[in-house]
C-alpha cells in the first residue's frame, strides 16, 4: 500500500532522511515563473539527495531553503531548456572554484554530449586551461551513465535505467521539442523520469 503524505516545509530543507523516499519541489512554476520558480525537484532517500533539473531560478530557490549549489551531490538533467539547466553553470563553476569538488551527473550518454556542446561549454570551458586545453565536462562532474534497457513500447523510444543508492530511476525519451514534430526521430533528445 502506498503511504503518501504532503507536508509544508516549516524550516530549511533537510537533504537526508531516515531512509524513506521523499520528493521535494524546488519550484512548481512554468519556464518564466518569478514567484513559484520552475519545475525542479529533489528526490531524497537516506543520505542521498538527487536534484532533477536545475533551472535559472533554482539557485535562488535553493538559497531560500538554506542551501547553495555546494549542497548538490547528484544531478539528473532531462533536457536543455533554460528552466531545466539554466542554473547548472553556477553549480559547475561554484563547486570547481569555491569547493574544489565535482558533482555526480546522471544523464544518458547521447544527451551528455548535446548538453555540453550545445548548452554548457561556452560558459564553463573557457574558464582556464588544463594541460594546454580548455576544460571539458569531466573537469566539472563525475559522470554516471545509466544503462540502456529494452522496453516493449508501442513506438520506438530510448529507455535507460540506473540505481542511485537504492533509488531506481528510469529515463524515457519524450516528444518535447519541437512541439510540432510527431515522429520521435524528429525530436531533440529529451527525457522524462
Predicted feature descriptions by range:
Residues 1-193:
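Binuclear metal-dependent hydrolase catalytic cores
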Amino acid at each position: 500500500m502506498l503511504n503518501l503524505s504532503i507536508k509544508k516545509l516549516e524550516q530549511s530543507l533537510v537533504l537526508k532522511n531516515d531512509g524513506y523516499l521523499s520528493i521535494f519541489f524546488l519550484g512548481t512554476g512554468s519556464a518564466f515563473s518569478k514567484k513559484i520558480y520552475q519545475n525542479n525537484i529533489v528526490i531524497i532517500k537516506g543520505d542521498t539527495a538527487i536534484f532533477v533539473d536545475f533551472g535559472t531560478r533554482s539557485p535562488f530557490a535553493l538559497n531560500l531553503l538554506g542551501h547553495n549549489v555546494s549542497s548538490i551531490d547528484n544531478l539528473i538533467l532531462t533536457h536543455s531548456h533554460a528552466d531545466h539547466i539554466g542554473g547548472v553553470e553556477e553549480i559547475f563553476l561554484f563547486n570547481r572554484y569555491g569547493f574544489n569538488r565535482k558533482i555526480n551527473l546522471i544523464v544518458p550518454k547521447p544527451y551528455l554530449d548535446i548538453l555540453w556542446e550545445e548548452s554548457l561549454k561556452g560558459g564553463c570551458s573557457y574558464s582556464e586551461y588544463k594541460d594546454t586545453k580548455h576544460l571539458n565536462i569531466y573537469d566539472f562532474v563525475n559522470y554516471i551513465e545509466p544503462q540502456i534497457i529494452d522496453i516493449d513500447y508501442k513506438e520506438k523510444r530510448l529507455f535507460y535505467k540506473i540505481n542511485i543508492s537504492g533509488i531506481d530511476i528510469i529515463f524515457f525519451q519524450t516528444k518535447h521539442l519541437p512541439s510540432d514534430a510527431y515522429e520521435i526521430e524528429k525530436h531533440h533528445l529529451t527525457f522524462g523520469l
